[in-house]
A protein has these predicted regions:
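Acidic anion/phosphate-binding donor-loop and adjacent secondary structure
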Residues: 184, 190-195, 199-216, 236
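Nucleotide-sugar-dependent
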Residues: 235, 288-315
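A conserved catalytic-core segment of Leloir-type glycosyltransferases
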Residues: 35-100
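N-terminal subdomain of nucleotide-sugar transferases
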Residues: 1-58, 247
């Protein structure tokens, strides 16, 4: 099968879509990826890239077609909006000309933003082939949960866009069974909605702890609680900081380690300083996903948090 994948994010950005394409290749499919210039979550183009190129690459046997976009920058609302709109516009205008090979299926890996599906709908109409949409994030609920948009007018426009995208999808896949009702309510044909959960990459398996002096990780001494992932609005980082402050005097052996990047990393750094938590709360840079099993093994506990929100509870 000839598959045209549309995703604003792709390798070398570390998302599950990379493994999806690799799996398709293993099964003998021919894949073309329509994506943007990698800039997540650093906010600027990765080394070797500019906002305008390179325009074509290869990933395994797959052809990668990149379109220019406005980098995310520091994640401010206007900059993020420009990032979202620029990809949707550039991919809609340049995608049809740059993705000319045979296509049997258009597949959208729909994280945030939902606007990345707009080019796919245009290509579906031009190429007259079916389109599958794999919903990873519900919009506009995600915008509300992340406190990114408060305007009822803007949220209403997003709602109308989402309805149009769902109605024009020949197959809607959802990563959570609790997503089924919201997507059907917004216009997806219930007979064409399927549950497709996410998976853990193959390298997430138990690994032996390194011997003293051999350990490739850098963790403080004590009972280490590791939070590894996006440091964003919905992760409720303030809850972890408050917990660290509460146990600081009674359990000084507990060490909290944050590893990752995101919109609230700067806030986290400032809060650690403001509350004098530097002895027990530590920041580490993000690491490649394939390196994380060793860090997980070295920690005493792994922590995952989401803000108490009805929308986030659907995931």
């Amino acid at each position: 099968m000839n598959i045209l994948l549309v995703s604003q994010y792709f390798w070398p950005e570390g998302f599950r879509v990379n493994d999806l394409v690799a799996g398709w290749e293993e099964r003998g499919h021919n894949v073309t990826v329509l994506t943007g210039i990698p800039n997540y979550a650093a906010g600027r183009p990765y080394p070797g890239y500019t906002a305008f190129g390179p325009s074509t690459e290869t990933f395994g046997r797959s052809r990668v077609v990149r379109v220019p976009l406005v980098p995310r920058g520091r994640g401010g609302r206007l900059r993020m909006a420009a990032n979202y709109v620029s990809f949707a516009l550039a991919a809609s205008l340049l995608g049809p000309g740059r993705c000319r090979g045979p296509v049997d299926l258009i597949f959208v890996f729909q994280m945030s933003p939902v606007t990345m599906a707009i080019p796919a709908v245009i290509l579906r109409r031009l190429r007259r082939v079916p389109m599958a949409l794999w919903v990873q994030d519900l919009w506009p609920e995600t915008l509300v949960a992340a406190k990114a948009v408060r305007s009822p007018l803007l949220l209403g426009l997003v709602e109308r866009l989402v309805r149009a995208l769902y109605r024009r999808s020949d197959l809607v896949l959802v990563q959570s069974e609790k997503f089924v009702e919201p997507v059907v309510r917004r216009g997806a044909d219930a007979a064409r909605v399927r549950y497709l959960p996410n998976w853990a990459e193959s390298f997430y398996r138990p690994v032996p702890l390194a011997k003293d002096g051999d350990d490739p990780v850098s963790l403080p001494r004590g009972f280490v609680i590791l939070f590894a992932g996006n440091l964003g609005e919905v992760q409720s980082l303030e809850t972890i900081v408050e917990a660290a402050a509460l146990v600081r005097s009674e359990a000084p052996q507990i060490q909290w380690v944050f590893m990752g990047v995101g919109r609230r990393r700067a806030w986290l750094e400032e809060e650690i300083l403001r509350r004098g938590l530097g002895a027990s709360v530590h920041l580490r840079d993000a690491r490649p996903a394939e390196a994380m099993p060793v860090w997980a093994a070295a920690a005493d506990a792994l922590l995952v948090t989401l803000r108490a929100d009805p929308v986030l509870a659907l995931t």
